[in-house]
């Protein structure tokens, strides 16, 4: 009852799947009518993720923030039948819903801080750079950005990364929907999930471990 959602229709999917949507989540306790007097914080999740962090929303609300989050297209609450979970061929596609969400927040809040986690940190950094050139009047509402464990580089030594970049660009342009082998990446998910070793209740369909 303390969380409300608003769905943003985004129209046709540039990757050819069903119509896409994004979802803005707002933490709205009983005194939420006073939210417009607060600065806003917008959380942007990472890859294969969604917003479920009640304790984070409660903490920042108690610190004086109006707390929002966005589930990006095909992620979490924004997924629709006929779509591959979390699939995009270009992270710049996320700029559309982030700009729309910021426009919505700027109608109620003079100040907005963006918090991006993991791949969300990469997306936020790229989006804000794009926004300052494409919509400076909206960018003016941004007071800062917090990048939480941002994925800004590959998890391999620099010489390996530089060698692989042209190969991956070539392969990605020709086979954009082919998945790369990733090995076992379950350690982090299990470490935070209450069903394994952590404390958080996570929907395994929205956030596969």
Predicted segment positions?
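Alpha/beta-hydrolase-fold enzymes
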Residues: 119, 123-209
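Catalytic nucleophile-loop/oxyanion-hole region of alpha/beta-hydrolase
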Residues: 47-48, 76-111
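N-terminal cap/lid segment of alpha/beta-hydrolase-fold proteins
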Residues: 1-35
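The Walker A (P-loop) glycine that initiates the GxxxxGKT/S ATP-binding motif of P-loop NTPases
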Residues: 116
